[in-house]
Amino acid sequence: MLLSEVNDGGFRSACTAWLGDRDVVVERLATDAFSGSAIVRVCNGDPGGDLVLKSFPAKARPRIAWVHGLMASLRAAGCREVPAVVSSRSGGTVVEDGCGRAWEAVRFVSGVATDEPSVRQARAASAAVARLHLAAAAWPAAPPRVAVPPAVTRRIEQAGRMLSEPWHSVATPGGEVTSLGDAMAARLVQATAIARETGLSGALQRVMAERAMPTMLQAVVRDLWSSHVLFTTDEPTRVAGIVDFHAAAGDTPATDLARLLGSWCRGPAIPVDDACREALAAYESIRPLSAEEHRLVPWLDATATIFGLDNWFRWVLVKGRRFECSARVLERVDRLVGRLPGAVAWLGGLQGPV
C-alpha cells in the first residue's frame, strides 16, 4: 500500500517527519498483541535499509528517549544485533503526531525467530546477550550498582497477593462477556486444579520466604522473548538482530537469561535441556555469572511461569482488559499452564525448569 492511501493522518505525519513528502510503500507488520502499538514497515528504497515505525502513547516520550540512548550506546560498543535508531529530519529520534501518539523509527532487521532453537542457535543467542550485557554495563547513563533485583522484589510481593487472593477467588467482571474472557476462564479452572494438585500455595510461601540478596544491577532488556531474537535466513546459526528494547530497565542480567531460556519450547524434538546448558556455557565464555546470578536464572524462570499466569488471569478476568490478538494471548497462556507443574515442582526442590 502507498503511504498516500493510508487512512491515518497521524501515521502519515510521522512518516513525513522522517521521509518528507515521498509517497513510499508501507506494510503493516503487526499491532503488538500485548501493548497495542502499531508497527509498520516503510519500504523507502534507502540503501541503509527499510524503516520500521512504531507508535507509543505520547506520554512515553521521555522513556522512549532513554531506550534510544541505550540502543545507540550498545551499537557504538559493537553490538550490531541492536537495530539502528534513525533520527528524523529535525534531528530527534521521537516524533509526536498530534493525535496523542509518539513514534520511533529503527532500521528493519531481516531474520527469523524460533522458539525451538538448535544447540548452535541457543549458543549464538546467549553469546549475543552476553556481549550486550557487557556493553550495557559500560553505559554512563545507567552505571552498575549493587541492590536487591527489582524482579525478585516484585515476585515476593506478588506471591503475597496471590496467597491473599488465590485463583479460585478470581471472578469475571460485570457486563459483556468476551470470547477471550470465556477462554481465559476455562484456563483459570485448569490452572486452579493444577495448583491444588501440585501444592502451589506452598511454592508461594517459599517465594515469600526468599532471602533477597543484593547483586549487581545494570541496564537489561527484561522482555527478551525468543520472538525478539532473529537469526539470519542464509546462516541460521548467526543472530541477525535483537529487537524491542522498550521494556529495558535496571535489573539483574539473570532476568534476560531466564526470560529467553524460559520462552524456548521444551518438546521432545529438541534437547532443550542440553540447549539451555550450552546456552549458559556460551554466555559465561564471554561474561561469567556470579553465584547469585546462577541461582536466580532458574528461580526467575519458575516464578515467571506462576506470576505470568496470574497477571493474565487478572488482566482479562478482573480488569477486563482487551487485546487485539486473542489467539496469541491464549497461546502464551497455554504454554504457561503447561509449564505450571514443573515450575511448582522446581520451587519445591524436586526438579528444575531449566
Where are these regions (language model features)?
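Active-site acidic catalytic loop and adjacent metal/ATP-binding pocket
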Residues: 34-53, 85, 198-255
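Protein kinase glycine-rich loop
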Residues: 28-33
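Juxta-kinase regulatory segment immediately upstream of eukaryotic protein kinase catalytic domains
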Residues: 1-25
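ATP/Mg2+ or Mg2+-diphosphate-binding catalytic cores
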Residues: 146, 150, 161-170, 177, ...
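All-alpha amphipathic helical-bundle segments outside canonical DNA-binding/catalytic cores
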Residues: 289-301
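A cross-family kinase active-site recognition segment
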Residues: 116-186, 215-217, 327
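Active-site activation/catalytic loop segments of kinase-like enzymes and analogous catalytic loops
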Residues: 253-288, 303-321
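ATP-binding pocket architecture of kinase catalytic cores
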Residues: 47-143
